[in-house]
């Protein structure tokens, strides 16, 4: 059984080789990206061996411990937990990153710092692997903060642009709010259980776990961009497209969902936290789907679709189905990375044009990218027998047969319908109709680096869901019966979304532009959320700070307490001590009045 951790550790160590070898300069800048890509492909093949063996062995988990240090009564160890979640996730993350690395070699070929870019992407992947294999909170926190700082460095890659720097700061600040919840939970577990090992935390199973679980939910809200802490996710599109693809598919944004899956043994009996989780996910998936409907930036549409799918995963955890949430994480990684790569191909060929209103007619000019974009969008909507269907259909069916909050489940169904609507709108504006781009643009998608990377993810977007869902626990699922209308709900709402979007697009294609309506403004301006929360609190905070500083420091301390108090004290003491009051004018006036009256009285009357 030692073979499982040994092989997984081998694949992890293989990933560190390119970072270690850069200190010796064994590879030139031109060959380094190829070296990194090959290492990741070898690590993927290596990780498949223990994964296959683990699935067929029927084991529940394998834990490897190496004692690190003891702080009084707290024992810290390097502990790796190889269970179903980590054993499946690692090959998926490696496969997707392999394709993204190959795509980056085409997309970033003219970047002068491409070696550093590949190092950052590799560190991003390594920190995510540390996070998913961690068996204690301290190790998990290292991976958690690692993906956070790497996202900051990668989003601000083009640091010459103000928008990129602002977006990176926004991402790190929103994640700081989530980290408060994580640290609070770590402190609670340390004081109440005297341990950070997951197994010991779960074995104690306290009844009053509302506070740490709400802290973990806050952490997941920040990292997985749930409603309230979501604005950083669309802003993160300021980074290069390979960063967007990696960030949204198999690394940072799913870390929050993965954290909740890890702590599900504590959540499953806590109805309060489950209700909060369900409602938060439902609001997120609907709100971000509404925002995606009117966006014109192709990358922002896909970004909002990510946030909507993350909301769906949170809903799944809220209805007590962590395995289905994990299945959706794995299936979502394939088609979401492919959608970003297709958008990157379109943007690159159209001279960095991201507005879908300035595209159109690309189906003939870019047939391979167009086909991949359509298949990816269909997989996203849950079209039968594509990868997304195997997870999304199961989630909708489970939600329909659960006895929890009906309003939250209805909202989720509406969001599922809107997914089809904004996907259809994106395809309609980007690929169909007449070309609206500049006529001088030369389009060429026949680059093997681009085509091979998208091809791999295209195969994954068609077949991966079938293979992963066949190996999900429990492997022997009892046959359930449900009415046909419940079984067909997911497909029905998806088709409804397709039809609605197509009809509206065709009906409004030749209409003149009118003044935008209130619902359009609400959707296009992201529910006024960034405007209110990015302008109002800083303004109020600055004005309050300014007033308090001027009142407390200037008026009270520097004026009233020190100078004026001393002068007033001296005036009062001088008036008490001195005989003269110093009223010269009054003295002269009284003298004049007295003199006048005396003269009037003493003058002889004629």
UniProtKB/Swiss-Prot annotation:
Transmembrane segments: 4-24, 38-58, 87-107, 114-134, 140-160, 171-191, 213-233, 241-261, 273-293, 301-320, 325-347, 366-386, 409-429, 457-477, 488-508, 583-603
Protein name: NADH-ubiquinone oxidoreductase chain 5
Protein localization: Mitochondrion inner membrane
Topological category with respect to the lipid bilayer: Multi-pass membrane protein
EC number(s) given by UniProt: 7.1.1.2
Signal peptide: none
Family: Belongs to the complex I subunit 5 family.
One Pfam family, short name: NADH5_C
Subunit composition and interactions: Core subunit of respiratory chain NADH dehydrogenase (Complex I) which is composed of 45 different subunits.
InterPro entries per UniProt: NADH_DH_su5_C, NADHpl_OxRdtase_5_subgr, ND/Mrp_TM, NU5C-like, Proton_antipo_N
Gene Ontology MF terms in the entry: NADH dehydrogenase (ubiquinone) activity
GO annotations of cellular component type: mitochondrial inner membrane
Catalytic function, reaction form: a ubiquinone + NADH + 5 H(+)(in) = a ubiquinol + NAD(+) + 4 H(+)(out)
GO BP terms in the entry: electron transport coupled proton transport; mitochondrial electron transport, NADH to ubiquinone; mitochondrial respiratory chain complex I assembly
Key words of the record: Electron transport, Membrane, Mitochondrion, Mitochondrion inner membrane, NAD, Respiratory chain, Translocase, Transmembrane, Transmembrane helix, Transport, Ubiquinone
Protein's job: Core subunit of the mitochondrial membrane respiratory chain NADH dehydrogenase (Complex I) which catalyzes electron transfer from NADH through the respiratory chain, using ubiquinone as an electron acceptor. Essential for the catalytic activity and assembly of complex I.
